């Protein structure tokens, strides 16, 4: 082996290494996409109602107070498992009525308690939000949140 690296040798090492790492990058990207689509997403299909519920979540800035899968503000409870905590994860009609009653009871005006503002959502918006929270509750969160209480 030569003690001096020629321009051709340097070019071949550069191109070979670049191709190697591009192949590794593409392989990991495809593996991640496959994992996300087939393993880590919710067990339910993404319906129009779920998408509208996500839009209600975003338009009313729910994440400014609540967390979803640990992301968001820690002022109010985690909502990724709220339908499980309420025992309505498999009953969309009960989930809707429970969420509607909760939202309509706010603010409670109880001294010393954090208050949720009244958003004046329509029944359709509340139903869509309930479906979104059911969908979120069925995602594979790998044990998050660590406590059932949220």
Task: Go through each PLM region and give its residues.
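Extracytoplasmic electron-transfer domains, predominantly the class I c-type cytochrome c fold
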Residues: 47-48, 55, 69, 73, ...
């Amino acid at each position: 082996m030569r003690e001096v690296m020629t321009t051709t040798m340097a070019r071949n090492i550069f191109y070979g290494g670049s191709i190697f790492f591009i192949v590794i990058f593409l392989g990991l990207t495809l593996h991640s996409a496959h994992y996300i689509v087939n393993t880590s997403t919710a067990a339910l299909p993404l319906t129009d109602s779920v998408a509208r519920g996500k839009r209600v979540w975003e338009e009313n800035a729910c994440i400014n107070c609540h967390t979803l899968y640990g992301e968001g503000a820690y002022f109010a409870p985690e909502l990724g498992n709220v339908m499980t905590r309420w025992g309505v994860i498999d009953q969309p009609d009960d989930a809707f009525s429970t969420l509607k009653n909760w939202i309509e009871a706010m603010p409670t005006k109880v001294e010393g308690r954090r208050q949720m503002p009244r958003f004046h959502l329509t029944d359709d918006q509340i139903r869509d939000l309930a479906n979104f929270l059911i969908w979120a509750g069925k995602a594979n969160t790998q044990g998050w949140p660590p406590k059932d209480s949220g």
